[in-house]
Each structure stands twice: as C-alpha cells, then as structure tokens.
C-alpha cells in the first residue's frame, strides 16, 4: 500500500486519481499511526518551500519521514516534494530542507546562455533525458513530462540525477539515491511517461513488501 503524506500543501486529488488509475492501494493521511500501515510513500507538494518545511515540523511528519527512510521504505517526492528532499532552498530566504539528498534549490533564470528570454515559472511539457540506469525506469519511455515550477535543484551529486530536462539550464527531472526518489515534474499529469513511472514505483514498492 502507498501512503500519500498529507501535510497541507500537496496536490492530493490528482495524485490520488493517478494512483487509482494505476491500480494501487493507497491511503492519504496526516496521521503518523495511519501512515505506518503503508509500504512506501509519496511526498507531494505545491507552494512555498519554507511553508512546507514548517508544516512538516509542526505536524511531526518530518521525523516520520526520517524514520521510514531509515527503515528502508521507498519515498517518492513530487514537484515541491522532490525539492524538500534536498539540503536547502533560497526561496523566501535560506531554508533548510530534509537533507536526504545533496543539493540546493535556487530560482530558475529568466534567460538562457544566449540571452534568449525564458518564462518563469517553467510551465508545460518538456522532454526528458535519462542519464543513470535505475529500476524506476523499467518500462518507462523517455518521453515528455509536465512541469510547473520556478525553482530547480543545483549542486547535486551527478550520479543522483537520473534524468533531466533542458530549460536554459539542465533541470534535474528525476533524482534518486537508494530508497529516496523524486520527480520535479508531475507524473500524475504527464500522460504515458508519468503513468509508467508511477506504475513502476508501485511495482518496486510491491516487490519490496514481498521480499521483506
């Protein structure tokens, strides 16, 4: 079963509907005891990095996330949820993140290296390029994904950048180290590629449960 962590800032409806379409058993909850019933977790997120970290601390969910990661359970961050996995963000002043992955979250530039203007936020479809082999990619086509974000991850470990998209800079699109995974785009809104990625995450969670 997949536990969707509800800390008050997630795109819960669209994530839930995507999990239903993927045939997954899931719960959406802010209650730690309820979430403990799950085998793997999704950390969604839309909004401010600082507000999200404050809510995770206030609800006790920050400690719960550290606990399940230490137990080896899969954690998959989506959009802001992915950014929260990193060390810090410059959004609204410097804010510490969960620190599960090395890297910092910074504002996208409004121009590319040739001076061509770019719209911020980065909103719409963009092509994915896979860099590192990962079990998360089994059966996942290297296609287009749907992005909505103004900040991106920089200074991360190159081997933990599993896929990227080009938006004036190389934007880490899928990241991962061990049981900690994330996508900057919205898999639940990303058609064939997004659904394939979610289904593979569910498959990995099922395999992990069976092999306990």
Swiss-Prot record:
Pathway: Amino-acid biosynthesis; L-histidine biosynthesis; L-histidine from 5-phospho-alpha-D-ribose 1-diphosphate: step 5/9. Pfam families: GATase. It is found in: Cytoplasm. SUPFAM superfamilies: Class I glutamine amidotransferase-like. GO terms for cellular component: cytoplasm. It catalyses: 5-[(5-phospho-1-deoxy-D-ribulos-1-ylimino)methylamino]-1-(5-phospho-beta-D-ribosyl)imidazole-4-carboxamide + L-glutamine = D-erythro-1-(imidazol-4-yl)glycerol 3-phosphate + 5-amino-1-(5-phospho-beta-D-ribosyl)imidazole-4-carboxamide + L-glutamate + H(+); L-glutamine + H2O = L-glutamate + NH4(+). InterPro entries: Class_I_gatase-like, GATASE, Imidazole-glycPsynth_HisH. It comes from the Bacteria. The active site is at residues 79, 186, 188. Its EC number is 4.3.2.10, 3.5.1.2. GO terms for biological process: L-histidine biosynthetic process. Keywords: Amino-acid biosynthesis, Cytoplasm, Glutamine amidotransferase, Histidine biosynthesis, Hydrolase, Lyase. Residues 1-211 form the Glutamine amidotransferase type-1 domain. Its main location: cytoplasm. NCBIfam families: IMP_synth_hisH. PANTHER family: IMIDAZOLE GLYCEROL PHOSPHATE SYNTHASE SUBUNIT HISH. Heterodimer of HisH and HisF. This is Imidazole glycerol phosphate synthase subunit HisH. The gene is hisH.
């Amino acid at each position: 079963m997949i536990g969707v962590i509800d800390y008050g800032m997630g795109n819960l409806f669209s994530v839930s509907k995507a999990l239903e379409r993927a045939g997954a058993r899931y719960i959406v909850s802010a209650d730690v005891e309820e979430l403990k019933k799950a085998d793997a977790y999704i950390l969604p997120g839309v909004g401010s990095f600082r507000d999200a970290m404050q809510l995770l601390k206030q609800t006790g969910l920050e400690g719960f996330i550290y606990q399940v990661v230490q137990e080896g359970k899969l954690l998959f961050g989506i959009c802001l949820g992915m950014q929260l996995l990193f060390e810090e963000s410059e959004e609204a002043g410097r804010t510490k993140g969960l620190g599960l992955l090395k890297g910092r979250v910074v504002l996208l530039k409004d121009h590319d290296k040739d001076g061509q203007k770019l719209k911020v936020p980065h909103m719409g479809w963009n092509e994915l390029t896979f860099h590192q082999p990962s079990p998360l990619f089994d059966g996942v086509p290297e296609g287009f994904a749907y992005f909505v974000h103004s900040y991106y991850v920089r200074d991360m470990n190159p081997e933990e950048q599993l896929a990227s998209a080009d938006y004036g800079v190389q934007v880490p699109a899928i990241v991962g180290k061990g049981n900690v995974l994330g996508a900057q785009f919205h898999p639940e809104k990303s058609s064939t590629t997004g659904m394939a990625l979610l289904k593979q995450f569910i498959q990995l969670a099922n395999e992990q449960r069976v092999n306990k």
